[in-house]
Swiss-Prot record:
Residues 48-158 form the PLAT domain. The keyword Signal applies. Disulfide bonds: none annotated. Keywords: Secreted, Signal. InterPro entries: Embryo-specific_ATS3, PLAT/LH2_dom_sf. Interacts with EULS3 (via N-terminus). The lineage of its organism: Eukaryota, Viridiplantae, Streptophyta, Embryophyta, Tracheophyta. It is found in: Secreted. Expressed in roots, rosette leaves, stems, cauline leaves and flowers. Transmembrane segments: none annotated. May play a role during embryo development. Pfam families: ATS3 (PF06232). This is Embryo-specific protein ATS3A. GO terms for cellular component: extracellular region; plasmodesma.
Length: 179
């Protein structure tokens, strides 16, 4: 009986570890940051590809012509910055829709901060932002509020490690639910 129990316990432990590290869900509230300045692009950094999916809330304005910028990174100072994600002629960020972007940037460890910047008069309410990459765990940041104008707004869950500071915890959830 003991021979069977030990391998079964090890299998369960390995399975839990595998699934618990598969996805991160950020459960804190987004905050404004006054002193955030995106970093310039690093010249000789290895390039990795990231998929960013931004879901606009169903309680947002029908669409926005506002300029939307994004910046995300890891605890080691690697950062991806896109000055303008939106394309006013294609009606991006429509109410109840998702917009997907393929973005290249420096290779990083797991993403622990993400900020959005909205500039304009239309307004916009993102529901969530999901980031995928071959070298990182997928992560979802939940906004679900109207972004203020001309203020970087988002999350820093780096827990004070490395070059970034945070007072917000990260919550990793064991889940195999579709994202």
């Amino acid at each position: 009986m003991l021979r069977l129990a030990i391998p079964l316990f090890l299998f369960a432990l390995c399975s839990f570890t595998l699934f618990s590290s598969a996805r991160s869900f950020i459960t804190t509230k987004p905050l404004p940051i006054d002193s955030f300045i995106p970093k310039p692009k690093l010249e000789n950094a290895a390039a990795c590809s990231y998929t960013v999916i931004i879901k606009t809330s169903c309680s947002s304005v029908s669409y926005t012509r506002d300029k939307i910028s994004i910046s995300f990174g890891d605890v080691y100072g690697n950062e991806v910055y896109v000055k303008r994600l939106d394309d006013p002629s294609s009606r991006t960020f429509e109410k109840c829709s998702s917009d997907t972007y393929k973005i290249s940037g420096p290779c990083m460890r797991d993403v622990c901060y993400l900020y959005l910047l909205r500039q304009g008069s239309d307004g916009w309410k993102p529901e969530n932002v999901k980031i995928y990459g071959s070298s990182i765990r997928s992560v979802t940041f939940y906004y679900n509020l109207f972004l203020p104008n001309s203020v970087w707004y988002g999350f820093n869950v780096c827990n004070g490690i490395g070059n970034t500071k945070s007072s917000q915890p990260i919550s990793t959830t064991s889940s195999v639910a579709a994202m």
